[in-house]
Swiss-Prot record:
Keywords: Biological rhythms, Signal. One of its GO terms (biological process) is positive regulation of circadian sleep/wake cycle, wakefulness. This is Circadian clock-controlled protein daywake. PANTHER family: CIRCADIAN CLOCK-CONTROLLED PROTEIN DAYWAKE-RELATED, PROTEIN TAKEOUT-LIKE PROTEIN. It holds the Pfam family JHBP.
Amino acid sequence: MQLTSASVCLLWMGLLSWVSHRIDASQGFPSPLKRCKLQEESCLVAQAQTFFQAFQKGIPERQVAALEPIDLGTMRIESGGHSESLKFKLVMSDAKLYNLANSVVVKSLKGFTKDLTKPLKLTLLMDTPELEVRAKYDVDGKLLILPIVSKGDLTIRMNEVQTKRRITAEPVKRSDGHSYLNITDYKTITKIKGGHFDLSNLFDDNKELRESTLKVLNQEWNTLALDVQPKINEACSKAFRAILQSLWANIPYDEFFKAE
């Protein structure tokens, strides 16, 4: 069968498209991220910072979710007996974390190694001047002798947040001969200087009663944080684990770094 010039052109276009698809499948880190040398922590920190700034809307073609805001899903919180005056059951739905990607300062990123015989233990440290969680809330509880049963919008502002993320990732060899990182554990630990709660529709928005109740709740920030903060950390861990796993899914670990 003799190929016409048009057929040859179409054949080449098909081959180029196939090659392009094969390259895209393992093209490494998306621009503007760059590879670093393994032990060059300053470069690793800079690339982590770039990731937060450059991909606030996520990377849809790689199934990487948005970083601003970050979807935290639903959190269920029950007071743990830290205060006799405050008892509650709180459901936060459609929760989202704001202000991280556009204000975070990455301080340290350590733990990468050439040894693929055991899991990697990564530690990421970062600071954020203010984070904000917004959600729909449903609360059933009491403050002193005052019942609090309400639904509405909730905002939690957290100031001067120091975060440590501990990530365990296992190298898994695939049929292509390359090893890829599979995250097996992700923990978030935070230290917060202070915070503030705001809830709409308390007591049918009776202004005087609402404001006096919020004043007492915010005076009890440290007590409330003992119950609320771990649940936010847990939700953040789940969200970031999915984001990072999607980023790493098709990047062979041997393509993470420049040659030494």
